[in-house]
């Protein structure tokens, strides 16, 4: 450093910001400025735009070329023959997720010190409601609120939920229970029997052979009019009717198809009456118009999707329609989305 500093012309530079955060000058740097000022040097004149231009040129490419998105085409025998309802949505919105997760079998590692999230709160709600509905599949007791709150206390205690987390979540849980009890009082008279956290599937023939769609429904209700209602609990964002009808939220229609085909254990093939989102603590979204047409279109989309991907020339491209891309993906960096999604006129 001393030898370099003794050269005829020396440029000393420092970062004023790192990732947007202002950086404090080092004591040595401030001492150097003081000495230069004492010698009468024009420090202000050294801070010229030319230096910034030189810095920009370090990472500047002579030619900007838009990179193509990945287009993996694994052999058909390596492609999945069983798909869950939640995976079907990713299949529609971002096929690359299916390639990375189910063909390459890559899985994101958990954080070493992972905080509890809204997903964990949702797990609590599902566990409490499953236990309650299994106790009361054909009735709704007068003391339902007290029983649900007691089940919640038991879950928090058994799973050793930290007191600070409990203090934050418990008021929300109480609010959810209040909303749920009100909704159930209006809804349960229509229900003959409730089935909670029930698994099911249906299969069809695709070009490369049998293909199976699976799902685990939060709730499937046999109603007094001889039909089936399917309910999906949501502690966060609930899907809109438009998303469901457009095919971009296929989970409930898939569960409806399983019910229609008799794919849930101990529930005979039955006409589907309603698909329902319960955004717990907030609102209810009911889909019941043109139900047979909705389910038929959903079935056609799934069969078409499986048929298209049964040909090796079909690539698992990433985000074919950016406007319908998933809100979050563990594999976006592997697909290099930020590289190829930049337009040719951007740097």
Q: How would you name each of these model-derived features?
A:
Residues 124-205, 289:
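A non-catalytic, helix-rich entry segment at domain boundaries
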Residues 16-19, 27, 34-52, 146, ...:
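Metal-dependent nuclease catalytic regions and adjoining charged, substrate-binding loops involved
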Residues 195-263:
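Non-catalytic protein-protein interaction segments used by genome-maintenance enzymes to assemble
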Residues 80, 88-96, 113-124, 144, ...:
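Secondary-structure capping and boundary motifs in well-ordered enzyme cores
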Residues 95-106, 148-153, 221-234, 274-279, ...:
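Active-site-adjacent bridging/hinge elements
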Residues 12-13, 73, 77-86, 105-115, ...:
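Glycine- and acidic
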Residues 1-42, 234-236, 241-243:
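Conserved C-terminal motor-coupling region of P-loop helicases
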């Amino acid at each position: 450093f001393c030898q370099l500093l003794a050269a005829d012309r020396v440029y000393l530079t420092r970062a004023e910001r790192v990732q947007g955060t202002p950086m404090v000058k080092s004591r040595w740097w401030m001492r150097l400025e003081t000495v230069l000022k004492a010698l009468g040097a024009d420090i202000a004149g050294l801070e010229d735009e030319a230096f910034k231009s030189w810095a920009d040129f370090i990472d500047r490419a002579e030619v900007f070329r838009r990179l193509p998105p990945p287009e993996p085409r694994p052999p058909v025998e390596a492609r999945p023959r069983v798909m869950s309802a939640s995976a079907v949505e990713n299949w529609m919105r971002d096929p690359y997720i299916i390639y990375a997760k189910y063909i390459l079998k890559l899985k994101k590692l958990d954080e070493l010190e992972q905080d509890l999230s809204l997903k964990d709160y949702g797990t609590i709600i599902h566990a409490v409601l499953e236990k309650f509905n299994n106790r009361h599949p054909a009735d709704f007791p007068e003391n339902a609120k007290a029983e649900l709150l007691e089940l919640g206390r038991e879950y928090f205690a058994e799973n050793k939920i930290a007191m600070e987390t409990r203090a934050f979540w418990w008021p929300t849980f109480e609010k959810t229970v209040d909303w749920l009890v009100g909704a159930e009082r209006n809804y349960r008279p229509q229900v003959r029997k409730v089935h909670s956290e029930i698994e099911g599937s249906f299969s069809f023939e695709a070009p490369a052979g049998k293909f199976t769609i699976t799902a685990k429904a939060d709730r499937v209700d046999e109603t007094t009019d001889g039909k089936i209602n399917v309910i999906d609990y949501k502690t966060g964002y609930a899907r809109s009717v438009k998303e469901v009808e457009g095919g971009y939220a296929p989970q409930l229609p898939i569960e409806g198809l399983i019910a229609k085909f008799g794919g849930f254990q101990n529930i005979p093939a039955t006409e589907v009456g309603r698909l329902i989102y319960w955004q717990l603590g907030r609102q209810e979204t009911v889909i019941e118009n043109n139900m047979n047409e909705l389910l038929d279109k959903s079935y056609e989309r799934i069969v078409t999707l499986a048929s298209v991907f049964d040909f090796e020339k079909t690539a698992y491209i990433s985000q074919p329609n950016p406007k319908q891309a998933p809100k979050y993906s563990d594999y976006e960096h592997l697909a290099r989305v930020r590289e190829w999604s930049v337009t040719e006129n951007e740097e």
